[in-house]
Structure formats: structure tokens, C-alpha cells
Amino acid sequence: MTKRYWNIDLEEMMRAGVHFGHGTRKWNPRMAPYISAKRKGIHIINLTRTARFLSEACDLVFDAASRGKQFLIVGTKNKAADLVSRAAIRARCHYVNKKWLGGMLTNWSTTEKRLHKFRDLRTEQKTEGLNRLPKRDAAVLKRQFSHLETYLGGIKYMTGLPDIVIIIDQQEEYTALRECITLGIPTISLIDTNCNPDLADISIPANDDAIASIRFILNKLVFAICEGRSSYIQNS
């Protein structure tokens, strides 16, 4: 894997609050190597470690994107949801930003059936086929469509398991992470000071509560994916 320069600036990370961890009482001792100090009851993340692992993650996604690989971005908490959908759309990635349905990856055959149902209902909705049904039947199907749109809308074009999964907030998305580990899917995870850094393939120590921090990390990863995709198109 070729190492590239991703312009990861420490001052920019500080302005985004990437270095602010959780309160010192809420910490995982395994995060000690990634913490540089304590300040006013909170842990301060060592940004040189953040820059190193973020750069490694950018190299990985660039390399994967340049070979036409598929990505899934997962971030379901309120602060991350909009950022995740925007980032994924920009980089042409799949995403889950509302709720992780248990077995979404490990029980892929069931997810595929749900996706087929969703696509069928979407076609009916577009062609106004639902309006030709009796009102009660149409109402039931519209509710089904709305439910599927909420939870599967971000993966509607996914035809198989993703090659790499990017996780925003390891604690919140633990089920998704465990499914990836079970299936051997490589993971990149944003981890705060209350997380276990040994679970994901690449763990990026960073504030997972501040919108500016999440945006900073996602922007770098998305830029690397887009650059990789451009390289793939040029070499095709």
C-alpha cells in the first residue's frame, strides 16, 4: 500500500475539537497510548497519533477505491446522521444513518429480500401503482415503504457485502462492528477515549461527539475515496 500525503493539519484538528476526549471517569485503559493529558476532568487525545492513523486509513481507502471496492459508512446517532449521508453521497458509498438492524450483514440473505421488497415498492411509488390499489392496501404498503426507506435507503444500491466499513462512534455502532469482525470485513473506526482500540482494523482516536470533529475525519476519508475512484476511472 503506497503512503500518500493527505494534508492532515494538527492546528486544524484542534480547531475542530478532535482532541477532546470523554471525562476521565469514562475511559478505557486500553486508550492510554492515545491520550496525551488530562485537562479539567477530561482526557486529551494525542493528535499526532490521530494524524498517523487517519493517514493510514486514507491510504487504505484510496487503495481500495482505486481498485473499485465498495464502502459502507455507519453512523446512526443524531450528531453524525446528516454528516454520514452527505459524506456517503459525495463519495458514492453506501450508508446506514438511522438504525442498524441486527443481522444486516451477517444475515445478508434476509437483508437482500428486504432490499428487493423496497425496490419493488419504490418502483410502484414512482409509477403511482400504489394509488391504483384499494385505500387500505395502499396505506399498508406506503407504511412499509416509509419504514424501509428510513432504514435501508442508504444501502438501496448495495448488491453484496461491502469491502470496507467505516464506523463513526464504536460504542454506538458496536453491533455493526461485531458483524464485520464475524465476516472478516475490514473496518475503520472513529474511537473516543471510552473505546477499545483493538477491535477495528484501523482505529482513529478522535472526539466522536463534536460535529466539527466527525466532519473533519469524514472529509479526509471521503477525499481519499474520491481520489481513489478518479484513479480507478482513469485506469479502466
Swiss-Prot record:
Transmembrane segments: none annotated. InterPro entries: Ribosomal_uS2, Ribosomal_uS2_bac/mit/plastid, Ribosomal_uS2_CS, Ribosomal_uS2_flav_dom_sf. One of its GO terms (cellular component) is mitochondrial small ribosomal subunit. PROSITE patterns: RIBOSOMAL_S2_1, RIBOSOMAL_S2_2. Its main location: plastid. Keywords: Chloroplast, Plastid, Ribonucleoprotein, Ribosomal protein. The keyword Transmembrane helix does not apply. It is found in: Plastid, Chloroplast. One of its GO terms (molecular function) is structural constituent of ribosome. The keyword Cell wall biogenesis/degradation does not apply. GO terms for biological process: translation. NCBIfam families: rpsB_bact (TIGR01011). PANTHER family: 30S RIBOSOMAL PROTEIN S2 PROKARYOTIC AND ORGANELLAR, SMALL RIBOSOMAL SUBUNIT PROTEIN US2M. Belongs to the universal ribosomal protein uS2 family. This is Small ribosomal subunit protein uS2c.
